[in-house]
Amino acid sequence: MKVLIVLTSHDQLGDTGRKTGFWLEELAAPYYTFKDAGAEIVLASPKGGQPPLDPKSNEPDFQTALTRRFEADAEANAQLARTVRLDSVSQADFDTVFYPGGHGPLWDLAEDRDSIALIESFIAADKPVALVCHAPGVLRHVKAATGRPLVEGLQVTGFTNTEEEGVGLTQVVPFLVEDELKANGGHYSKGPDWGSYVVRDGLLITGQNPASSTEAADVLIRQLTIH
């Protein structure tokens, strides 16, 4: 099993002057879920190299056993420091792709032509795609084979409007994930704020928030083993 994990290269939180990037738990949890299942993992980002970590995601309140494991893992950190460029990867080399969130993807991956084409290619090849938290927002321009939005008519979830309000960034983000999924015709559902909630519809797996990262990765592995 070979898994591609796609991370953001964007580090500016709108015009706030604050830093953003990927959310550590949303990388660490699937990374070890896949690694412990024996998968080969490749990390990619639009710019390649070291992707920006949202500094808030490594504060004590947001650390988990898996984020601490990642922080202490020299091999994982070396791999993170040298992510491959997104425009150099091919769907044909992987069984699946997983997108961690953090606010960064709303600015770069959501508009990135290589990312859009990559997701479309995985779906066309009948391979599952998983995205958690803000990452379902990167589906905003992704099309199905029909030319319609990929999420149209599908069961989906993602970071809720109330969760965005809870972190005080409703007026900062370029769009709200919940609203965007609904606008593209997705059948959006959600669980309680900050609790694990994962939805699978065919090849598409979406998770609501950081707490959903492990469950989303588990669902993805099950999908691969029965697919």
Predicted regions and their residues:
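Extended, subdomain-level signal for the structured scaffold at the beginning of enzyme domains
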Residues: 1-125, 137-227
